[in-house]
């Protein structure tokens, strides 16, 4: 694109592991996520009690990491390589964001299977935006983003295809 303000960029990449229980299983998942991303992990808590799954409200049941900047781009390149740079159109939302799953943490380079820990999967969410979208989030002089400046599904597919060589089916 000729206009720099119209070129989409990766705002952030969120890597999430839903374990479903607290305890040693969650601690193992946090350690794996810390090793893969090289960044501190944040715990996710249950929003409500689910007796069928023995989950209580505010119990830690998952963990996540938010990557930005160069770390996000490097992780995204690796994660897309694991899924063979192929995504399905249903993995995109109307705002141009994309989410996909990675079934085994052992697919990442340098990660080996440990029988004491087991195998963990993870969800990767990529938020794509255009420069200037801060105007809708800032405190002073908040404005709406014009419709023609919002990232659409087609824009994000074209961006991922051009920047990362992703094929969308």
Curated annotation (Swiss-Prot):
GO terms for molecular function: rRNA binding; structural constituent of ribosome; tRNA binding. Disulfide bonds: none annotated. GO terms for biological process: translation. Keywords: Ribonucleoprotein, Ribosomal protein, RNA-binding, rRNA-binding, tRNA-binding. Pfam families: Ribosomal_L5, Ribosomal_L5_C. GO terms for cellular component: ribonucleoprotein complex; ribosome. It comes from the Archaea. Belongs to the universal ribosomal protein uL5 family. Part of the 50S ribosomal subunit; contacts the 5S rRNA and probably tRNA. Forms a bridge to the 30S subunit in the 70S ribosome. NCBIfam families: PRK04219.1 (NF003258). This is one of the proteins that bind and probably mediate the attachment of the 5S RNA into the large ribosomal subunit, where it forms part of the central protuberance. In the 70S ribosome it contacts protein S13 of the 30S subunit (bridge B1b), connecting the 2 subunits; this bridge is implicated in subunit movement. May contact the P site tRNA; the 5S rRNA and some of its associated proteins might help stabilize positioning of ribosome-bound tRNAs. This is Large ribosomal subunit protein uL5. It comes from Methanosarcina barkeri (strain Fusaro / DSM 804). The gene is rpl5.
């Amino acid at each position: 694109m000729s206009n720099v303000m119209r070129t989409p960029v990766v705002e952030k990449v969120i890597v999430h592991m839903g374990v479903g229980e607290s305890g040693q299983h969650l601690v193992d998942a946090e350690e794996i996520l810390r090793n893969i991303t090289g960044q501190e992990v944040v715990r996710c808590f249950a929003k409500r009690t689910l007796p069928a799954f023995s989950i209580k409200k505010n119990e830690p049941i998952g963990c996540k990491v938010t990557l930005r900047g160069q770390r996000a781009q490097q992780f995204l390149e690796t994660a897309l390589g694991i899924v063979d740079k192929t995504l399905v159109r249903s993995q995109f939302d109307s705002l141009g964001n994309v989410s996909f799953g990675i079934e085994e943490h052992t697919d990442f380079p340098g990660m080996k299977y440990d029988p004491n820990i087991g195998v963990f999967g993870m969800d990767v969410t990529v938020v794509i935006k255009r420069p200037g979208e801060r105007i809708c989030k800032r405190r002073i002089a908040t404005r709406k983003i014009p419709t023609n400046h919002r990232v659409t599904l087609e824009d994000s597919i074209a961006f991922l295809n051009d920047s990362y060589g992703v094929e969308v089916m």
